Amino acid sequence: AYSNLIVNFLRKRKRTIDSEINLSSALKEVGGFYQTIVKSFDITLNFVCEDTIEYKIKQIDFESIVINMITNAFEQVKGRENRKITVTISQSASHLIIYFEDSGTGVPEGKEKEIFRPFETTKENGIGLGLNIVKDIVEKYHGDISVKRSETMLGAKFIVTLPKGDE
C-alpha cells in the first residue's frame, strides 16, 4: 500500500522535461504527500531550503531522489523513540548540496559503499533498490552521494552533491 502511494504520486503528471525547477516548491509538494504517513507514525519531517534555490533537473529525477531518501529514512526511524527526518538544501557557487539526516540507527560501519549496490539492504523486508536508484540518478547529473553519521541527529547523514552549470 505504501509503495502504491509513491507510484501514484510519481504518475500524477509528466515531469520528464529538463528545466529549472524551484526546489523549495518541489520539496513542499513531496512533503504534502508524506504528511499523512509521518503523522500516523509521529515522525517529524523538516525541510530546510531557501525559496530562491533553483536547479536544472528533470522534476521526476529530483522527486525520485527525495522520495527514495525519505522512504529510506522513514524505515530507519519509524520504530525508534525519537523520530526525526530533515532534508536540507544549500548551494555554493559551483554545487547544489542536499543533506538527508535522520535519527535512525545509522549505516553499519563498513557498509558505507555497499549500501548503494543493487539488492543490498540492511532492512528485514527491504529490496535494496532505493539507494541504488538515487545513486544512478545522481551520477546521471555528474554528482556524488556519500553517507556518514549525523552529528546532530545521530542517525545517517546522506550527502548528495550535484554540479551547477551545463556539465
Task: Tell me the role of every PLM-derived stretch.
Residues D102:
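Acidic ATP/Mg2+-coordinating residue in the GHKL
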Residues G130, V134:
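Short alpha-helical Gxxx[C/S/T] motif in the catalytic ATP-binding
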Residues G143-D144:
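Conserved glycine-rich
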Residues V107-F119:
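Short conserved segment of the HATPase_c
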Residues N82-S94:
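Short beta-strand/loop element within the Bergerat-fold HATPase_c
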Residues T44-E54:
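Conserved catalytic submotifs in the C-terminal HATPase_c
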Residues A1-I37, D42:
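Conserved DHp (HisKA) dimerization/phosphotransfer helix of two-component histidine kinases, i.e.
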Residues V138-E139:
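Detector for a conserved hydrophobic position within an alpha-helical segment of the HATPase_c
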